Amino acid sequence: MRRLLFATLLFPVAAAAQDHSMHDMPAQPAPAPQEAPVDHSMHDMPAQPAPAPQEAAMDHSMHDMAAMPGMGANAVGGSGSALLPAAEGAMRGFHATTTGNWMLMAHGVLTGVYTDQGGPRGDDMAVVQSMAMLSASRPIAEYARIEFRAMLSLEPAMGRRGYPNLFATGETANGRPLVDRQHPHDLFMELSARADVDIAPGTSLFLYGGPVAEPALGPSAFMHRRSARYLPLSPIGHHWFDSTHITYGVVTAGAKTDAFQFEGSAFKGREPDEARWNIDTPRLDSWSVRATWTPSPHWTAQISHGRLKEPEVQHPGEDEARTTASLHYARGGLSAMLGFSAKNRLPGDTLTAWVGEANWDLSRHHSLFGRIENVANDELFPDHADPLHDRLFRITRFEAGYAHRIPLGKAAELALGGSLAAYAKPAALDAAYGKAPISGTLFARLALGQ
């Protein structure tokens, strides 16, 4: 019988009596019966606390997130400057309003994962995935706001080779290509700042970037999408859609209305190197543009194009022209995404990928999720002596799973679940991968917020 390992996760939740609900505000002492209620509209900043000995008490309201840069009536912020449907809800976590009108937010995810990837080229492994995000935002003028963001991960501790993930490619470890494995994230996933200035009712300009940030290319990264919330492993199409979500050197400028956002970025095209604990030298040698349409709180669509200078160390001298399009939907407990990407190696072939994924919260405790991917990959056999070296194969991956959610107060959650994955592939791969490999994954996901 195969060994099954779950990490025991302990997460301190301070001040358990505090209310972090998206809808329930902590009761405030009213100075008079006729006092007007606080306005939490999308356009008003949080009201100043009345002078009192309790003035410094922290406000843990989830509605205050609406005042953060990048949000509007129809959209909320995803990763970088990307947008998602407002019906997904703002990112949740621990919030506090301090003196100086700074709004602080802390959000984190710690996931113990055991995966058994099937077939002759599969492997099994237990790993811990992690992400912690801190942000601070405040108004700097009547019509201007600023935000600072930091996102960190301890995944480099799992080693350069990462974890098994059948048909995943695109990185190296110890100078050798990683095949059928997913690399760990860097320690520094984001160190960025953003400034927004309102120029007309419902219209603003923004500037975003930093030494570690995300350019305006592709959809919101998979770990920030509600449609991928409980999917335990990275998508095998990661290098088609959101491989730029950790980029060393980004400057983005854009304009936003309630229905549209247009933006352009200058950034470093080369993906992070194998040294995951440090910050690579920032550079601005690549560019991208993105247009996003948010017609209602339930729909978001984006199309983007970028020119990346030598993004992958495995393909020296090759630039990449990448085009992506995605459609996102959210209503009630359902979040879904459909995406397409084409990366054209210059010089070289154009490789395309499709992805469809969804998460459905059936109730407060039960969720179903799934993802279907179809990618054209020519990196499965890096050995030049292999007869299948540089051959292009189209792979389809089907994954579905279930999560049992256990609320821990109003701002934390433990989710226990698992998924199964099957694959459709050309017969030429049977000798290497087996005729019908099946992969299984179990996870325990502890989240502060989201």
Predicted segment positions?
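N-terminal periplasmic/intermembrane-space "pro-region" immediately following the signal or transit peptide
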Residues: A17-H107, T111, G122-D123, S135-Y143, ...
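Outer-membrane beta-barrel "beta-signal"
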Residues: A400, I406, G434-Q450
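Repeated loop/turn-to-beta-strand initiation elements of outer-membrane beta-barrel proteins
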Residues: L104, E142-I146, P201-L205, A259-E263, ...
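Transmembrane beta-strands of outer-membrane beta-barrel pores
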Residues: L110-G118, L152-M158, P211-P215, T257-A259, ...
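Residue-level signature of outer-membrane beta-barrel architecture
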Residues: A136-P139, V197-I199, G254-T257, W293-P295, ...
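Outer membrane beta-barrel transmembrane domains
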Residues: S304-Q314, S335-G348, T352-N359, H365-G409, ...
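Residues that define the transmembrane beta-barrel architecture of outer-membrane proteins
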Residues: W102, D124-A132, H185-L191, H245-V251, ...
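Surface-exposed coil loops of outer-membrane beta-barrel proteins
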Residues: G159-T292
